[in-house]
Amino acid sequence: MNRQAILRHIILTAIVSICTFISIRGQTKDSLSVKIEDGWIEKIDNKIGIDVSLNNSYEIFEVKTEDTKFILYPNTASNLRFNVNYKFISFGFQFTPDFIPGNGEENLKGNTKSFELRTAFIFKHWFTDLSYSKVKGYYLKNSADFTTLLKGDPYIQFPDLNYYGFAISTGYSSNSKFSFRSLTSQTERQLRSAGSFIPVINLRYYSIDDRSSGMSTQKTNNFESSIGPGYAYTFVSKEKFYLSLGLQSSLGYLNTKLTTRQPDGDITTNQDNYIFRWDGKVGLGYNGRSFYTGVYTNISGTEYRQENTTAINFETRVYYHLFLGIRLAAPDYLERKANKIEKLFQKQNASN
């Protein structure tokens, strides 16, 4: 049995086992430890949420000058993500298995390996999201602009092009009647329609490194910081069905260190650029006490002008995120530990 078949078997076995476990337990604990804040938010403190999702969130690079455009894509149509969520904390990882349709066309687009870790801490008002991701192997999506491609011909490939990055985002949800968790970790349920102003600060470091054996290769080290306002609103029907709309924009600074490796020595240059980002989100979902599901669509844009050149880097993309999750009873000791941490954070906020 090959690796893909073994992985499919493990995933299916886990899903079937969990669903069977849930069906046996039924609804016996649905009403336990239910906490409702002023009729707006229901806290699900006695259960752990486990979900699996598909998304097309991956790093691409698009550079456009007056007469040339380069669009580099990894050979990954969709990512598979697993998440565990409890109270204020969420942890997950994602990768790109070949058995998902659209992945694994290595003869045509080359081989890509990617992986991401992500964790989030979401309190009453404040939240922080941290992530680490890496990708190896890209292809030139617009190869036809540089050569004549016939059906079945491979794209121009960059198997030794590597990306890795760290990111942290911190924000504040101003409306206590709005549940940010209900849209992100699903550890709460929004019972009535509400919206909130959400400013966010973003910090990001990433590197793009061509590790091929060519005579001249390049590497960039990039640091980006930005800040901007946002707003989100959740329309709720029958306390379980919801439609969410959100808009976020940010203005920031991008510093790029470019190293060109040549046989007679490295050449290093630095650039400083202002960067503008915007993001719009639409979500539709079901958030019950035993399971939850939904689909989110994001439209995002990024633009900045390279220093001392006429080149403009821009990117406009559409993302999807389809998820399905269930809730299991949390161990008592986990609930006690989490309550201590949450109370400590609340005391520090109150003292400030």
Task: List the model feature ranges, each with a label.
Residues 1-40, 241-243, 324-328, 350-352:
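Bacterial Sec-dependent N-terminal signal peptides
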Residues 116-221, 298, 352:
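Outer-membrane pore/translocation modules
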Residues 57-79, 90-110:
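Surface-exposed strand-loop-strand hairpins of Gram-negative outer-membrane beta-barrel proteins
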Residues 54-60, 86-90, 95-101, 123-125, ...:
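Transmembrane beta-strands of outer-membrane beta-barrel pores
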Residues 52, 80-86, 117-123, 168-174, ...:
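Residues on the lipid-exposed face of transmembrane beta-strands in outer-membrane beta-barrel proteins
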Residues 166-170, 316-352:
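Outer-membrane beta-barrel "beta-signal"
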Residues 66-70, 101-105, 151-159, 185, ...:
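Extracellular loop and loop/strand-boundary signature of outer-membrane beta-barrel proteins
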Residues 44-50, 78, 87-89, 124-128, ...:
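Outer-envelope beta-barrel architecture signal
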